[in-house]
């Protein structure tokens, strides 16, 4: 019986521009982080990156990433359809719940498809504790892997000075 891998599931990197980005390796840690940031009043300055295998992919491979078929990628229609459903019905819903913003609908959405990848972009302006901020969620799948990249960014909206 082998021991589970005990490496950290979160790391922090600093970009060339000096921005701090939290990088996550699993969905649960990512969602917990978002919930904690909301409780800590840091919800409007968050920059996260999540790289993970979607739950439906792990389920099909019996929770073993080594058993994921090579054909599970952005060229596989079934994978793309299931990923889109996962994003719309689970990931965005979980973000909405973690932020405690039931009115969050992500109506501003787009899809970009190239031979190398598919990208879905979801944007929404929100208000929480009397503070306006923009939420940007970008989900990307690639032609060579079942790994999915999610970028989650919140940016405060500058308050307009009263005349």
Swiss-Prot record:
GO terms for biological process: energy reserve metabolic process. GO terms for cellular component: plasma membrane. Gene3D superfamilies: Respiratory growth induced protein 1. Transmembrane segments: none annotated. It comes from the Eukaryota. Keywords: Cell membrane, Membrane. It is found in: Cell membrane. It is a peripheral membrane protein. The keyword Glycosyltransferase does not apply. Its main location: membrane. It holds the Pfam family RGI1. Belongs to the RGI1 family. Involved in the control of energetic metabolism and significantly contribute to cell fitness, especially under respiratory growth conditions. This is Respiratory growth induced protein 1. It comes from Lachancea thermotolerans (strain ATCC 56472 / CBS 6340 / NRRL Y-8284) (Yeast).
